[in-house]
Curated annotation (Swiss-Prot):
Its EC number is 2.3.1.-. This is Acetyltransferase atnC. It is an enzyme of class 2 (transferase). Pathway: Secondary metabolite biosynthesis; terpenoid biosynthesis. GO terms for molecular function: O-acyltransferase activity. The chain crosses the membrane at residues 10-30, 40-60, 68-88, 306-326, 333-353, 370-390, 407-427. Disulfide bonds: none annotated. PANTHER family: LONG-CHAIN-ALCOHOL O-FATTY-ACYLTRANSFERASE 3-RELATED, WAX SYNTHASE DOMAIN-CONTAINING PROTEIN-RELATED. Acetyltransferase; part of the gene cluster that mediates the biosynthesis of the meroterpenoids arthripenoids. The pathway begins with the HR-PKS atnH that catalyzes two chain-extension steps to form a reduced triketide, which then primes the SAT domain in the NR-PKS atnG to initiate three more cycles of extension to give a linear hexaketide corresponding to the polyketide part of arthripenoids. The FAD-dependent monooxygenase atnJ then performs an oxidative decarboxylation at C11 of the atnH/atnG product, via an electrophilic aromatic hydroxylation with concomitant ipso-decarboxylation. The gene is atnC. GO terms for cellular component: membrane. It is found in: Membrane.
Amino acid sequence: MALVNNPIQAFANVALLFAVQILIPAFLIITTPKYSWLRYFGIPCIAFPAYLIFQLAPTLSNSIFHNSFLACEGILVVAHCVNLLLILQDGGLTWSDLRRSGVAGEKSETPPDATFLRKLISAVRLVVSLRGVDTPWEAKNTPPHPSSLGPGGGSRASFLIRQGAILAWQYLFLDVLLEVTKQEPPENTDKFYRPGMEYEYLNLTAEERFIRAFMPFVSWFVVSRLLLDSTWRALSILFVASGLGSPQSWRPLFGSMWDAYTLRNFWGKFWHQILRWPFTSNVNFLTRRVVKLPVPSLLDRYTNNFLVFLLSGILHAVSANIMGLSAVESGSIPYFSSFALGMMLEDGVQAFYNRLHADKERKTGIWKKVVGFIWVVFWMSLTSPWYMFPSRRKVAGEAAWVLPFNLTEVIGMPMMWGLLGTFGMLVKWAFGTSL
């Protein structure tokens, strides 16, 4: 497939490649037995479209974030399909496994001789569900639907109205952030993010220390979360409105930020769990079935943690390549890998504290959460510059995303803040949203 500079044609090509990535594993799941040589042959057939998607990604738009997101999704699908075709249920999933697990619906509704199309649709839904929602393999801590929608996500209409209203508010917020980014003085890049600054710790001014503490909080809790969540909501609207998906299968992407008072909770409860099932399944296969580490053991636990974060770092290094940074320049591999060490430290402190207070109630008090949030921000202030400063220098004061229409430029920042606040309170009142 020839690479193109026309965004519309590039989008069409990427959509076709994603369709190939989804249909090949779905077809193999329902037609081949476990350990079939066709499954092994299918993996490179799924990986090649991922390579082409990566090549096409820079031509899709002027938004570095969304181009990188699509490039990484293609690669992530490969890891997901290795699990579905070769690892899960000892040799990969088959149609019989889908029926027994209830993924294909109730057994009475899905006889063994169900039509080929019905089987294919069931398999496709599993392939596109990177978190395994509503399956026996659902990623741990996948957030439930909000109480305002009910456990099943509510009716199609109520789901679409809620998602559309929240997405509109997120769009306004991203519009404001885009304008704020444009107004940042260009000299700040050299002042705060100059080369080598990410590894400087001792000779920092008070202003530089504040930037280090403030930037990770804004980047992870606000900007990155908004960009990912708005993209997820837009996709949910597209799939549910078209009938390709149901509200039940499009659960919230993020948990509550109030749970992020430990590093383990930040990544395991608050942050999205899209990488969790594809990566942990492959890592567990390596450590437990190939290397045969003792289970359960601290060696197994922390080796798995490290390897999962290492894979995440590699994936984000690939993402950084879209903006012209090499894997080494991006700093993503040491950054994400460092969280394995951070979790070891906090697990040790928590174990020591619990041993001293073994006779007391283990409920997490407010003061413990405050201390925990301070710890999370502290660790991120130490390590986030490794990953964020190189990309900040690369975009040089520009935003990593673009919007089709900038309302802030039309009505001005003061009125935009008022609109954002008013609409936000309306959305909060009408749909019971939370942080």
